[in-house]
UniProtKB/Swiss-Prot annotation:
GO terms for cellular component: plasma membrane. Phosphorylation at Ser-77 induces dissociation of PP2C38 from BIK1. This is Probable protein phosphatase 2C 38. Keywords: Cell membrane, Hydrolase, Magnesium, Manganese, Membrane, Metal-binding, Phosphoprotein, Protein phosphatase. It is a peripheral membrane protein.
């Protein structure tokens, strides 16, 4: 493995900040970019306040995210909601970018058809987005076969009519900060279930779904992987592990599995929980797994609980980066000098969205707050697909 000191010597002489519009940073209503960091320090949603931030590590940002606040159906008279989506791409940005553009629209469509929000609406929206992306893969297969190996972990939260819907496919995570009045503390409560082969429960699920495949999960270099290839068991995309038609040339050999399969190896169906929001529920921390590699649930909740709301998502990311630097026995100031691509040796792309819950607003079906639509990453995220 290349040492931290060696990488610093490689990049220090030629390092420069990625170009951004304006001088040191850019600011507008949709957030601000400062080098590899994007942030929207504060804003209002229909049920309270929020803070968002993204740090890029990959050469192309693979994390995409969205916060929508307003009608959650195709009609302005429909229920008001706050929608949060965190999409952690792997193999490239295409799947995460696609989901960021289309999943919320599919949720609005099915909410309208259903005349309301439900777990079934969310599942339908995930599966419709999956089918749309697989259709895109099919169209581009001959000219861009690599797109069959691209996928995205998808975490969604919807606050609507006093309920919180959490849907997850992959290993991003949402943690609730809940006030324990008797002990005068704010306790971390994980609301999402994760789909990573490192978890025994996930390995057992895979074995039960594929009883005739002894290689469905393989321990490779001390890491459990599905078919020895990928750690997550659910995603949108990853067509090469969903449809046998993509498990062949011209896809690179490292992505092909030797056995013929007749049903999807990975799944796109999200695990969904519905939580009634109580006055003790203070805030939610949505984040891609890059944050949770460096901070525990309770550490993240303690930071949000004890620090000012303004810029709190950015503070969580900076705290995680300090931990990443410490693990590599280097200074945080030196880590900040490392450019994208090389930066991936030290940490992943990280997305954090902190959503504060105002108990006076949560249960309302209407709100006078302005409509809001913001995508995380700004100029870092590149063009939409």
């Amino acid at each position: 493995m290349v040492s931290s000191a060696t990488i610093l010597r490689m990049v220090a002489p030629c390092w420069r900040r990625p170009s951004v519009k304006g001088d040191h940073s850019t600011r507008d209503a949709n957030g601000r970019c400062d080098g590899l960091l994007w942030y929207k320090d504060s804003g209002n949603h229909v049920a309270g306040e929020f803070s968002m931030s993204v740090i890029q590590a990959n050469n192309l940002l693979e994390d995409h995210s969205k916060l929508e606040s307003g009608p959650v159906s195709m009609f302005d008279s429909g229920p008001q909601a706050t929608f949060v989506g965190v999409y952690d791409g792997h193999g490239g940005p295409e799947a995460a970018r696609f989901v960021n553009k289309h999943l919320f629209d599919n949720i609005r469509k099915f909410t309208s058809e259903n005349h309301g929000m439900s777990a079934n609406v969310i599942t339908k929206a995930f599966l419709a987005t999956e089918e749309d992306f697989l259709s895109l893969v099919r169209r581009q297969w001959q000219i861009k076969p690599q797109i069959a190996s691209v996928g995205a972990c998808c975490l969604v939260g919807i606050i609507c009519s006093g309920l919180l819907y959490i849907a997850n496919a992959g290993d991003s995570r949402v943690v609730l900060g809940r006030l324990e009045k008797a002990f005068k503390i704010v306790k971390a409560v994980q609301l999402s279930s994760e789909h990573n082969a490192s978890l025994e429960s996930v390995r057992e699920e895979l074995r039960s779904l594929h009883p005739n495949d002894p290689q469905i999960v393989v321990l490779k270099h001390k890491v459990w992987r599905v078919k020895g290839i990928i750690q997550v068991s659910r995603s949108i995309g990853d067509a090469y592990l969903k449809k046998a038609e993509f498990n062949r040339e011209p896809l690179l050999a490292k992505f092909r599995v030797p056995e013929v399969f007749h049903k999807p190896i990975l799944r796109a169906e999200p695990a969904i929980t519905v939580h009634k929001i109580h006055p003790e529920d203070q805030f939610l921390i949505f984040a891609s797994d890059g944050l949770w590699e460096h901070l525990s649930n309770q550490e993240a909740v303690d930071i949000v609980n004890t620090c000012p709301r303004n810029g709190i998502a950015r503070k969580l990311i900076k705290t995680a980066l300090r931990e990443a630097a410490k693990k590599r026995e280097m200074r945080y100031s030196d880590l900040k000098k490392i450019d994208r691509g090389v930066r991936r040796h030290f940490h992943d792309d990280i997305t954090v969205i902190v959503v504060f819950l105002d108990s006076h607003l949560v249960s309302r079906s209407t709100s006078r707050r302005p409509l809001l639509s913001i995508s995380g990453g700004g100029d870092l995220a590149g063009p939409s697909t």
